């Protein structure tokens, strides 16, 4: 063949094609490969790495097994992605807290972007926008505001929760959800959730169930770490894109509707001291887009409604299985509070066992067993191993909470573990000492839950009142499933599955107190009519 006669365009095409093929081969050969400088981990296979070994649901169980084998920090290769799983509390402190400037980012996620357009604080990248929105939330929900004002709404809603458990015990799975949702919506929007059949509450928990499933680690095809998957028909990969878009549409519909109601009220000249009222009052000083406004209210509605209610339901279920714990709580409450009133936030220091029960519920059944993944913004070295820039950082909350070297018989509900932790969780989260942390139910680093002060009071007030009023037990002939493997919903957020519960009023005179306090709560509720 006379190559001198070959057109230059043909030669150029061959070179470009060859280069493309070589590039693709290099890409495919690198995919799934674990370089020796990474932390150790389970054996990889070409292309996939460890992707096929990562469970599609409840990965925290497998991650905890791997942590025992490979240590408190191990790595997974998921196609081109490097995932670092941390189960070591000391490492958690030294990386996420002490190096928070590089460990506060989120992994790039097409699914999260499809759902939220990257305006949701939970999945938003760390930067100026995140800091600005976080500051707005902090200013309203910081501890002095909870101590001075917000507790009044919490007390009133807890009084209704007692009334609802007394008069509608068959809806015991819904009352904690209404309680936490009404506190949140009242403070954020100035809108109460008056009944368990409230439209906004139904829509929120419906979308939260779907979002939890979509966001769970391993549940969605790894389209971010292996981009070629994006071009495949999505029906081959579980319709991942349609599922994400559906969740986004549900969020937009609900959050727009609630925001519109706030604006309509303000147009009628009715202003309230709610979070969203303050944000709208300050739009000239701190301008926000319409989408930012929707998701700013939405993220608070989600976080404030789901975590507290899931933990209260966990505690009630634990009381049915551990009657000795319930009896000890009853005895302490009875020694401090009579029948003429129910416990209040002012009783916190005198009821340390209630605080222990709450901490143990966080440890025993964490709402988010793997937290929300972080990402590292630049290369970092830990103990002579490399954590590459862009790596996904997973907090194995479950593994830390069920570490038998720290907690004896971790599968059992034993509140006395926390006898030496009398303060609120925020105190230990702020400690500079890694071994002083009580639990990781609120996350770690700069991404720690901004509503931690409100949530701690939600839980104490609600649980103290419920245990003052009632004795919870399993119905005759019925046994609820408290198994960690099968007793809770799947997703990145966990809640106990529906369970039966027999509810007995502890003393006849408490009925009168419950009804009277419910009537007194109407004075607070009238602010939201």
From Swiss-Prot:
Membrane topology, record value: Single-pass membrane protein
GO molecular function: heme binding; iron ion binding; monooxygenase activity; oxidoreductase activity, acting on paired donors, with incorporation or reduction of molecular oxygen
Residue ranges annotated as Lumenal topological domain: 26-529
Residues that, per the record, bind heme: 449
Glycosylated sites: 81, 383
Keyword terms: Endoplasmic reticulum, Glycoprotein, Heme, Iron, Membrane, Metal-binding, Monooxygenase, Oxidoreductase, Transmembrane, Transmembrane helix
First-tier enzyme category under EC: oxidoreductase
Cofactor: heme
All ranges on the Cytoplasmic side of the membrane: 1-8
Domain of life: Eukaryota
GO biological process, one term: patulin biosynthetic process
Localization per Swiss-Prot or TrEMBL: Endoplasmic reticulum membrane
Keyword Membrane: yes
Gene Ontology CC terms: endoplasmic reticulum; endoplasmic reticulum membrane
Pathway of action: Mycotoxin biosynthesis; patulin biosynthesis
CDD domains listed in its UniProt record: CYP64-like (cd11065)
Transmembrane segments: 9-25
Catalysed reactions listed for this entry: 3-hydroxybenzyl alcohol + reduced [NADPH--hemoprotein reductase] + O2 = gentisyl alcohol + oxidized [NADPH--hemoprotein reductase] + H2O + H(+)
EC number: 1.-.-.-
Applications (biotechnology): Patulin was originally used as an antibiotic and specifically trialed to be used against the common cold, but it is no longer used for that purpose since it has been shown to induce immunological, neurological and gastrointestinal effects. Genotoxic effects of patulin with dose-dependent increase in DNA strand breaks in brain, liver and kidneys have been detected in mice. However, more recently, it has been proposed that patulin might also have anti-tumor properties.
UniProt record similarity statement: Belongs to the cytochrome P450 family.
Protein role: Cytochrome P450 monooxygenase; part of the gene cluster that mediates the biosynthesis of patulin, an acetate-derived tetraketide mycotoxin produced by several fungal species that shows antimicrobial properties against several bacteria. PatI catalyzes the conversion of m-hydroxybenzyl alcohol into gentisyl alcohol. The pathway begins with the synthesis of 6-methylsalicylic acid by the polyketide synthase (PKS) patK via condensation of acetate and malonate units.
Listed name of the protein: Cytochrome P450 monooxygenase patI
Source organism of this protein record: Aspergillus clavatus (strain ATCC 1007 / CBS 513.65 / DSM 816 / NCTC 3887 / NRRL 1 / QM 1276 / 107)
């Amino acid at each position: 063949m006379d190559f001198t006669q070959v057109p230059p365009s043909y030669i150029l095409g061959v070179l470009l094609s060859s280069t493309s093929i070589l590039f693709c081969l290099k890409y495919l050969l690198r995919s799934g490969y674990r370089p020796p400088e990474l932390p150790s981990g389970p054996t990889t296979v070409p292309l996939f790495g460890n992707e096929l070994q990562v469970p599609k649901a409840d990965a925290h169980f497998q991650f905890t097994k791997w942590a025992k084998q490979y240590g408190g920090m191990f790595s997974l290769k998921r196609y081109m992605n490097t995932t670092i799983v941390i189960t070591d509390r000391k490492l958690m402190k030294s990386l996420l807290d002490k190096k928070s400037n590089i460990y506060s980012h989120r992994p790039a996620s097409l699914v999260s972007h499809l759902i939220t357009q990257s305006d949701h604080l939970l999945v938003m990248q760390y930067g100026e926008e995140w800091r600005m929105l976080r500051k707005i939330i902090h200013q309203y929900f910081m501890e002095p505001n909870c101590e001075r004002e917000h507790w009044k709404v919490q007390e009133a809603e807890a009084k209704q929760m007692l009334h609802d458990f007394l008069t509608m015990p068959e809806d015991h799975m819904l009352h904690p959800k209404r309680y936490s949702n009404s506190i949140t919506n009242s403070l954020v929007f100035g809108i109460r959730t008056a009944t368990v059949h409230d439209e906004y509450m139904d829509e929120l928990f419906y979308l939260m169930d779907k979002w939890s499933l979509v966001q769970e680690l391993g549940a969605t095809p790894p389209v971010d770490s292996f981009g070629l998957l994006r071009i495949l028909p999505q029906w081959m990969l579980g319709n991942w894109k349609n599922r994400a878009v559906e969740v986004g549409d549900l969020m937009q519909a609900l959050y727009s509707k609630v925001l519109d109601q706030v604006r309509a009220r303000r147009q009628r000249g009715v202003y309230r001291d709610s979070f969203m009222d303050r944000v709208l009052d300050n739009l000239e000083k701190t301008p926000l887009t319409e989408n930012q406004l929707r998701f700013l209210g939405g993220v608070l509605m989600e976080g404030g409604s789901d975590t507290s209610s899931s933990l209260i339901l966990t505690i009630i279920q634990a009381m049915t299985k551990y009657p000795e714990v319930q009896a000890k709580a009853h005895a302490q409450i009875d020694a401090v509070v009579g029948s003429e009133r129910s416990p209040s936030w002012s009783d916190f220091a005198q009821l340390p066992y209630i605080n222990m029960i709450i901490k143990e519920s966080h440890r025993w059944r964490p709402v988010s067993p793997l937290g929300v993944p972080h990402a590292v913004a630049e290369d970092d070295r830990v103990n002579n191993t490399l954590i590459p820039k862009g790596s996904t950082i997973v907090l194995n909350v479950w593994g830390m909470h069920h570490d038998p070297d720290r907690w004896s018989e971790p599968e059992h509900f034993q509140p006395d573990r926390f006898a030496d932790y009398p303060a609120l969780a925020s105190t230990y989260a702020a400690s500079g000492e890694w071994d002083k942390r009580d639990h990781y139910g609120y996350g770690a680093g700069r991404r720690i839950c901004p509503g931690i002060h409100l949530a701690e009071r939600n839980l104490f007030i609600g649980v103290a009142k419920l245990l003052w009023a009632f004795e919870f037990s399993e119905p005759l002939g019925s046994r609820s499933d408290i198994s960690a493997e099968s007793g809770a919903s799947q997703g990145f957020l966990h809640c106990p599955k529906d369970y039966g519960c027999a509810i007995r009023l502890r003393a006849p005179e408490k009925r009168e107190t419950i009804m009277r306090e419910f009537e007194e709560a109407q004075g607070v509720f009238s602010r939201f009519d």
